[in-house]
Regions:
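Tandem repeat scaffolds
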Residues: 1-169
Length: 169
């Protein structure tokens, strides 16, 4: 397109395997990405707005400047990735895995994250991590490192939050 993006919008990409060093400037807007695997060092400047991401696996080192606004998916695996400036606002990512992620300057406002796991995740941000008006029912924030977070007007039923203070002592 005019901005230099590869346009893979509104496509059925079920069970595709994207492999390479860097995946950059790709638009997956409104695409069906069920059972897709991304295997690369970095995904940058990509747009997954309103995409269906059921059972997607991100085997990457880093996602940078990536948009997931209004994306929906069950069992999305982001584990062990650096999520740097990722916008998850208004997304529905249930039963998803954010375990051992380093999450920097990312937005989770208005998200539905039912039963997702952030075990041993680190929230490294210049400002507070934001989960404003999110549904965090049964979400596990277990042994996380977080300096400050905004959970204003969020549903937190059955949410578990335990903070790892080990580097303080």
């Amino acid at each position: 397109d005019a901005q230099g993006y590869i346009d893979l919008s509104e496509l059925d990409l079920t069970s595709c395997h994207f492999k390479g060093d860097v995946i950059s400037k790709v638009s997956f807007i409104s695409s069906n990405l069920q059972h897709v695997t991304f295997e690369c060092k970095e995904i940058g400047d990509c747009n997954f707005t309103t995409a269906i991401v059921d059972n997607v696996i991100f085997k990457c080192r880093r996602l940078h400047n990536v948009i997931f606004i209004k994306a929906s998916g069950d069992y999305v695996d982001f584990s062990k990735n650096i999520l740097d400036t990722v916008d998850f606002s208004q997304s529905q990512l249930t039963h998803s895995n954010f375990c051992e992620c380093q999450i920097r300057n990312s937005n989770f406002d208005h998200c539905y994250l039912y039963a997702s796991h952030f075990t041993r995740a680190e929230f490294l941000t210049d400002k507070e991590i934001s989960f404003i008006k999110s549904n965090l029912t049964a979400v596990m924030f277990d042994h996380v490192r977080i300096s400050t977070g905004n959970f204003k007007d969020s549903v937190t039923q059955l949410m578990v939050l335990s903070i790892d203070y080990s580097d303080i002592f």
